[in-house]
């Protein structure tokens, strides 16, 4: 059965879009090369879904950025990851921006 574009239904991206700045920052840390960054994300996508970077390297980069191991679950949806980081680091992302 041939499929058409009308058969494709993407999941919502409302929560991810609402946290766009923070989501993009996390993606930039996890995978600095724009060629390997996603062009679209849904609310169901985790950081592990979004970039091809190995988990150990993502963790290392996030630990270096935050200057601590926050014990983050990289398999949860990105928007939930952002909310988790904000609970652990209430001033983020502004408190870690370069001067």
Region roles according to the model:
Residues 1-99:
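Phosphopantetheine-dependent thiolation modules in NRPS/PKS and related acyl-activating systems
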């Amino acid at each position: 059965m041939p499929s058409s574009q009308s058969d494709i239904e993407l999941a919502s991206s409302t929560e991810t879009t609402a946290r766009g700045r923070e989501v993009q920052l996390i993606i930039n840390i996890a995978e600095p090369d724009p060629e390997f960054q996603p062009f679209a994300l849904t609310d169901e996508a985790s950081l592990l879904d979004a970039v091809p970077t190995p988990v150990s390297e993502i963790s290392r980069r996030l630990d270096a950025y935050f200057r601590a191991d926050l014990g983050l679950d990289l398999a949860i949806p990105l928007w939930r990851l952002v909310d988790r980081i904000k609970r652990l680091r209430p001033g983020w992302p502004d408190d870690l921006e370069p001067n």
